[in-house]
Regions:
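Structured, helix-rich domain cores that form ligand/interaction pockets
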Residues: 2-3, 8, 21, 65-328
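Alpha-helix N-cap/N′ positions at the starts of helices
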Residues: 7-11, 35
């Protein structure tokens, strides 16, 4: 019995030390773990005894904040349509923001006639009931909204659940995987596509060298380095892999060798595919599991073995490292 208590004590001590070393606040870890900051504070101060399952959850979530982790996950684009014209309700009750602090403009995009914005958080509306209210968060908008969620002691999961309960229709969800150590080699993946060492639901791919014109749909196409698209850009599921370090070099002047993120792998989902991804997120509360299950379902890179059928070719080692369980170690 004493051994179990000691083990639990060590777990809590290690949790607290790692959290502080990672520069993560109690509030941020608590939100990620689905508990309140007050509850986590009581656990760390030994005033509350957590269950084994909760301790495991806390350690698992804390591991995602490890600044030395080779891969990290984030939401990079969110577009949701709400079947209502009550924009104040969406802003107050779903986003939980104050409309009085938002900028109102008498124009919009996507044929909407007006919009409210707070930084890069945009909410569009019009008099057309069929169009309803549209929320759009691009990359910077997602990062800004995360700060508000943290202040609200909510997670992305809480927000998405609120949106679905209110009848929100998922129009687009992008999940981004940041490669901090160069696990992926984009030119190598492009060459494997050319050599047909790529198995996927779609054979379509496009590869652009640095500086080449990328489809107009990219907001920062002039900054993106070598870029590989897997799948048709017109489909409801496709992937975009590009050199994030090059983007930061061109935009901010950050030397390539000092870039925090080397490559970015984006999973872009629309309509029904976006809805099913959100449903999976709200089933497992594990964005990493959802992201890699989608990747594994749609694409894998292999090494040619002439004496075997293509479906039996060996998984490419670098790709296996990227999608495998050992990527966290």
């Amino acid at each position: 019995m004493g051994g179990m208590v000691l083990n639990e004590e060590q777990w809590i001590k290690e949790l607290q030390e790692k959290r502080i070393a990672y520069g993560i606040s109690q509030g941020r870890l608590a939100v990620a773990s689905g508990i309140t900051r007050e509850y986590l504070n009581k656990i760390e101060s030994r005033k509350m005894k957590p269950s084994k399952e909760l301790l495991e959850t806390l350690h698992k979530e804390l591991a995602r904040f490890n600044p030395e982790a080779p891969l990290t996950m984030l939401f990079d684009y969110v577009k949701i349509r709400f079947p209502t014209l009550d924009i104040q309700h969406i802003i107050k009750d779903i986003l939980k923001l104050n409309i009085n602090y938002m900028l109102h403009e008498d124009y919009g995009h996507y044929s909407y006639t007006e919009h409210y914005s707070l930084g890069d958080i945009f909410i569009y509306t019009s008099a057309d009931e069929e169009k309803g209210v549209l929320l759009e968060l691009k990359g910077r908008g997602c990062r800004q909204f995360e700060s508000y969620l943290l202040a609200q002691q909510r997670s992305w999961y809480d927000f998405l659940m609120d949106a679905l309960i209110d009848g929100g229709v998922m129009k687009r969800i992008d999940l981004a995987i940041n490669d901090h150590t160069g696990i992926l080699d984009i030119p190598e993946l492009a060459e494997k596509c050319r050599k047909r060492e790529y198995i996927g639901k779609s054979r379509s791919y496009k590869f652009y060298q640095s500086g080449e014109l990328i489809k107009h749909r990219e907001d920062y196409r002039e900054y993106m380095g070598r870029t590989l698209y897997l799948g048709s850009l017109k489909s409801d599921v496709y992937f975009c892999i590009y050199e994030k370090d090059y983007e930061q070099y061109v935009k901010l002047g950050t030397p390539l060798e000092k870039a925090d993120i080397i490559n970015r792998f984006e999973i872009r989902l629309r309509n029904e595919r976006a809805y099913y991804a959100v449903r999976d997120l709200l089933t497992y509360y594990d964005a990493e599991q959802t992201a890699f299950s989608i990747i594994n379902q749609y694409v894998r890179f292999v090494d040619e073995e002439p004496d075997k059928r293509k479906n039996d070719w060996k998984l490419n080692d670098r790709w296996a490292w990227f999608i495998g369980d050992n990527r966290q170690s």
